[in-house]
């Protein structure tokens, strides 16, 4: 629900701060993204089962609820047209004067690399990480902050790209384990290749017209996600 909460934050910024800069919209989107992420984590903590299939499904359900709220308020405020640029990812807006915000992700990615081993340990669970001397809550909060800010920057610049952050890291982990120090750059390269494929398909399917990359990645990503779920269920049963 992080990206959907970011879009809700963008809508709120457009309603209350219509003439302000993209920086302010990014800040509001980051705050909402963090709120959506904490909501997701709060629900997960109350559920006893931590099944690998159940957790992402809960995230998808939360995304659906937040997305519905966003569309409802956008419709009531007659802002569907204004919000459409952020509903689905589109590289057409990556032009001079718009994409410079993406440079802010560089130091954030460096911080993610520096904390990658700590993130790996925290993924083993709070009790195990604490026994190893890790400040679990601090590391988790840093990770959440990085995810929320980076997600907001990308959505403000390009728009939402469905399933990218869900399927690519999971596929990389399937083949390479859970070592984030290796998986971060592998996920980046794999995600870039996936986006390039979706962009090419979006440009050639109905040439000379173009399909938004968010629509293409949504169709392909949902299919891959179903395959991953069915594969997991087959291995378990």
Region annotations inferred by a language model:
Residues 1-237:
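Alpha-helical transmembrane segments in inner-membrane proteins
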